[in-house]
């Protein structure tokens, strides 16, 4: 036994994980090295603690106190209603446009998820979502960034977080499409970390083969550590980037680098700004932003009883109205502060079915939804909210900005998202004076127009032809 092994063996014994070495003697040297490397990177004690905590039912008193203390979020910029509101939004837009012109904005797309609900066999960004063409999610975002760059004569770096599950294919896809003409040197792919799944009953780390732990991406909260370890926080600082526009891979109608959102964020010197939309019903399965003891936090829909979800404040408005669209703007220095102590973002436990190799070396694929065999661990980026000293919430226009692709069918599916893209296109065309029947699909590339005003102007000048849409 070499000294590395004896050290590893001690740690494994102490944390009841010796089964990881069960097949060590049967492995090739490189497999042995790889297994020891995976074990070396794993915080065995922390995993043990988390598993132990997961076997208690948590602290229902703390959870109940959190919900009782929750108030409607305080600092919210609402959608404009009055002329004064419109003036405020106009001013914020001008401030945001200036930040863009000055080159202070970068986009971060988190694209490391496994997209299991959609059931698409490739990274979700490669999903064809165009109502008339096979335009993918990646292409829509790339074209939005290119169009913003052209409009403001500026550089907007694009940072894409991938994972073991999505990296190689994403890289090949972007190469094959020549980075959609953004220039390879301004698109940064970086990989998030991964964490092993644990057997829910025993806390033992699951293995996917004789030499591999059953790993999965460490959640969108893995962004903070991943940015830092890829050296990107330094790079952003060198490029004088101040604002990181964060969004998820699944919403093709997000307004990337939305000048109004950027403007409010910059005006208020917010460290973390979040776009929210009004929930359609209290029962809607959406996390909501609230104020808890003076801090902004997210309450997950699963934390609320139906009665709590429908609770109203003194103005008769739902307390839990402000649905999280996962569109955020981070102040770069705030991200640096988070990265300096990454343990500030807690690990969350989710019970899921995870395939694994049993003690005889055979693969088992549990599939009982009522009794998941494993716990998976993830960090959530929105846990940064209560850490921030200065947060801001801006209400977005739901039908325009939030039409995600989550499920294979039904709500939040390719059908609803494609229909939204067509509807938005029809609205822009109507504003330009062209009526299109409701059942006719419309697809407007961000390179043709980023909004209704631009489309009107370009149709008038002939730069865009009706026949092309
Ligand atoms: P979701 O919570 O929708 O998860 O991710 P998912 O993995 O994409 O899909 P399901 O739940 O398996 O169906 C929201 C966003 O966070 C990213 C996803 O790529 C998506 O943009 N994400 C999620 C990561 O980048 N890494 C992760 O580890 C998890």
What are these regions (language model features)?
Residues 96-98, 234-235, 263, 318:
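Short, flexible, glycine/charge-rich loop motifs used to bind or transfer phosphoryl groups or to couple energy/partner
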């Amino acid at each position: 036994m070499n000294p590395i092994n004896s050290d590893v063996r001690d740690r494994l014994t102490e944390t009841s994980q010796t089964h990881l070495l069960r097949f060590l003697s049967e492995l090739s040297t490189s497999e042995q090295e790889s297994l020891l490397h995976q074990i070396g990177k794993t915080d065995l004690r922390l995993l043990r603690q988390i598993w132990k905590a997961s076997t208690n039912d948590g602290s229902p008193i703390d959870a109940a106190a959190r919900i009782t203390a929750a108030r409607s979020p305080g600092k919210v910029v609402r959608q404009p209603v009055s002329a004064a509101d419109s003036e405020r939004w106009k001013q914020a837009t001008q401030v945001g446009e200036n930040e863009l012109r000055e080159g202070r904005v970068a986009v971060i797309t988190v694209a490391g998820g496994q997209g299991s609900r959609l059931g698409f066999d490739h990274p979700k960004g490669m999903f064809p979502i165009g109502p008339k063409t096979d335009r993918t999610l990646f292409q829509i975002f790339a074209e939005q960034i290119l169009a913003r760059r052209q409009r403001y004569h500026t550089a907007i770096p694009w940072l894409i977080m991938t994972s073991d599950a999505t990296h190689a294919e994403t890289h090949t896809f972007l190469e094959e499409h020549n980075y959609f003409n953004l220039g390879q040197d301004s698109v940064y792919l970086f990989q998030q970390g991964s964490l092993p799944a644990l057997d829910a009953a025993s806390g033992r780390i699951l293995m996917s083969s004789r030499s591999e732990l059953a790993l999965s991406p460490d959640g969108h909260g893995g962004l903070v550590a991943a940015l830092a370890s890829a050296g990107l926080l330094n790079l952003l600082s060198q490029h004088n980037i101040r604002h990181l526009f964060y969004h998820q891979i699944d919403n093709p109608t997000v307004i990337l680098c939305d000048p109004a959102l950027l403007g409010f964020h910059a005006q208020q010197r917010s460290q973390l700004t979040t776009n929210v939309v009004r929930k359609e019903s209290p029962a809607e399965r959406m996390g909501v932003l609230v104020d808890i003891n003076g801090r902004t936090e997210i309450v997950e829909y699963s934390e609320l009883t139906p009665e709590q979800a429908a609770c109203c404040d003194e103005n008769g408005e739902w307390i839990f109205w402000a649905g999280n669209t996962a569109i955020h703007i981070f102040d770069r220095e705030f991200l640096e502060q988070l990265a300096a102590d990454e343990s500030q973002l807690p690990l969350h436990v989710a019970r899921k079915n995870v395939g694994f190799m049993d003690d005889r070396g055979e693969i088992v694929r549990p599939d009982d939804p009522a009794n998941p065999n494993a716990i998976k661990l993830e960090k959530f980026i929105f846990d940064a909210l209560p850490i921030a000293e200065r947060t801001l919430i801006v209400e977005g226009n739901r039908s325009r900005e939030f039409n995600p692709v989550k499920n294979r069918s039904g709500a939040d599916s390719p059908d609803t998202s494609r229909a939204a893209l067509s509807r938005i296109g029809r609205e822009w065309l109507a504003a330009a004076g062209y009526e299109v029947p409701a059942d006719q699909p419309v697809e407007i590339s961000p390179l043709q127009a980023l909004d209704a005003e631009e489309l009107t102007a370009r149709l008038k000048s002939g730069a865009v032809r009706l026949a092309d849409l």
